[in-house]
Amino acid sequence: MKNNLLKLRKERNLTQLSLQMQTGIEQALLSKFERGERIPPTETLVVLAEFYGVSIDYLLCRTEKPEVNR
């Protein structure tokens, strides 16, 4: 998961601070998620998936396809 979170943020040219400001998720937690030191709780996964427009399965590296099935 850590690779997809970092990849998504970098693809959008976001800093952790700007992501914090847009999602309300603390920068320190974002850093830990990206480094694989913590796993985001379900509520945080939902926020990140909606923000990035990807599926939770993509965030969790369960699929290589970022598309959301609607």
What are these regions (language model features)?
Residues K7, E11, E50, L60-R70:
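Short, charged recognition helix plus adjacent turn
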Residues G24, E43-Y58:
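DNA major-groove recognition helix of helix-turn-helix/homeodomain DNA-binding modules
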Residues G24-P40:
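Recognition helix of helix-turn-helix/homeodomain-like DNA-binding domains
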Residues E37-E50, P66-V68:
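Short, basic-rich loop-to-helix N-cap that marks the start of a DNA-contacting helix
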